[in-house]
Amino acid sequence: DVSAGKNYIENRFLRAEIDEESGAVIKLTDKRSGKNFAGEKLGRAIICNDIKNDTWAHAVTEFNDEIGSFGGGKCEVIENGPIRATIKSTVKYNNSVFIRYYSLYSESDSLFVKCRLDFDEEYKLMKLCFETALQEPSVTYSMPYGSIEKDANSQEEPSHAWTDIHDRNGVGLGIINDGKYSFCACGNDRRR
């Protein structure tokens, strides 16, 4: 079975708690192990300054000049059935709106998130920060025909379909996407 309230969604495998103000996940607990994977906030949407770069940001290895974040959010349950439950989170930054649909299925141990961004900012970029509770993490990311593991050194790296941030015991958090091809990881914070 799966259920949702205004700020949480859960099934027999996972419980996710959403911070209404930021729209980020503040707890992501694996019910089988009791482990919480969320650090401060998983999926916090930040704004970085991009005024000094050319169109393609040649020779730039980091985009970490954080100047703001999305906020003023609201959450609402839009689906709460026996097979799937979904929470809609809406946050804003100036004229930009970021909507996320967090869904859990009754027999899945994955949290599904669909995102929709109306970004109306000049010389700025938006990044999603996945701050985990992992200690001394390493990062593995997908590349054509394989994967590669690197230290979490805050440099932008190409990544195609997925990224995995894990501790030395192999316990970690995987993020699968179909639309963005770059990320950076700094300590236990992974940014896409």
Predicted feature locations:
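C-terminal (or distal) subdomains of carbohydrate-active enzymes
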Residues: 1-192
